[in-house]
Amino acid sequence: EEIETPVSAETTAGNQAEEENNIPEQSSQTGENETNPDPTEAAAEKKTFTVEPNPQNFNQTGISFVFPGAIFGPPELIQVEGSDETEMGGPFPGFKYIKFDSYFQNFSIFSPDMLVFPAFDYRKMNEYANESIELLLTMVADPQKITNAEELPFLPSFNAAQVFHSNVEVVEFKNGKGLRYLTAYYQDYSPVTNEYLWYTFQGLTTDGRYYVSITIPVYHFGLPANYEIFKNSYKEDAKELQNDYQGYLAKIASMLDQSAQNEFNPPLIVLDEMIKSLQIR
């Protein structure tokens, strides 16, 4: 079965001009606004979300966690065969792929998922994975090393660059810990839009046996919905992007870092609670 993960996403923001301005539906959540904000007002007027999580239990093949039923439908676990190919993030051992169905938001090109790899095998057969896991262990042990890092660990790899990261925290789950952060990946000098923004958790069990990679799209009212909205309505940001891309990215990261957890949809605290409930055996 073909799985939809960031590994298979090759579209860049440069060809999004025909995309519609998709706004996240509120479903069982409530937001102060349900339409795209005027970009001139977005920074001044903060939008917040509240959610009644409706906690639901997942427990299959040694993986258990409590997920917010208000955000996700029943997750589906799929066993994925390993691959010796070096393309699309490989080589990698067989792993467990958890697909979150019935995700109510339609603003992102990505789907939320959880990947659980046997870490020893992964490290043995993939040098990039081994280096990423070593970097993760170093950063979790000494969070000061996160401060000046150009890139944070993310597995599996794919053919795009991590252009920024923000909202970084060390989060512990039932039998391990890792890094939670927001990021976007691009193949060119593209603006950060809600189509490409995601929350990720990269973690390792305490015994070192399992590596977990979680990716969940999130929405922030301070960002344009897509490239077309950015091009037409965010004139100053577009000018800054052309003149100083790194400065533009630093401004975006700072804006997200200074945002409260409930200024994101879904609220980051709700996603963090799901991470904290995770146990992998």
Predicted regions and their residues:
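Ser/Thr-rich, Proline-interspersed low-complexity disordered segments
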Residues: E1-T50
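Short, low-complexity, polar/charged sequence segments that are solvent-exposed and flexible
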Residues: L136, Q202, K231-K235
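N-terminal "mature-domain start" segment
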Residues: A44-N175, V270-R281
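Short, surface-exposed beta-edge/turn micro-motifs
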Residues: T35, G208-R209
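Surface-exposed amphipathic alpha-helical segments
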Residues: V218-R281
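Low-complexity, polar-biased intrinsically disordered regions enriched in Pro/Ser/Thr/Gly
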Residues: Q79-G90, L152, D188-Y196, G222-A238
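Signature of long, low-cysteine stretches enriched in small and polar/charged residues
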Residues: K145-D207, T215-P224
